[in-house]
Amino acid sequence: MKRLILTFVTITCIGVYAVGQTTAPSKRRVVKTGPPNGIFSPAIIVGDLVFTSGQIGLDPKTGQFPEGGFEAQFNQVFKNLTAVLEASGSGVDHMVKATVFLADMNDYNAMNDLYRKQFKGDPPARTTVQVARLPRDARIEIEAVAVLK
């Protein structure tokens, strides 16, 4: 009888511990990259996930868009996104979801051509939408969710 009670108590304790582990809130960690802007965080880590803020194609050194139109902005967006993900302990190849915001859906095919070159394997899940306007009149903005390395 003692053995049965001990087994029951042990199983109950394990069950309570497991439920606590799955329902306990994860700690949130803010990732700091570049000069602070005070308006939003470049990325937030919760558990094993990294959530980035949207990245536009501003060169962080000059504060300007690179010359060269849509392709140049796209390439700078991915440089910025890569920098934020790497500062978070992740990387582009660990992205699981991306949301692409385009100022003009006529850039969709060009974006797809450039986008597929960014990944070694299967690309992450993705949503692409056209928006009325982006900050600083950017042509593209990308936000991502990634897992830690």
Q: What does each model-identified segment do?
A:
Residues L4-F8, V16-K79, A83-D93, L102-K149:
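N-terminal presequence-like segments and the immediate start of the first folded domain
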Residues V96-A98:
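Surface-exposed aromatic
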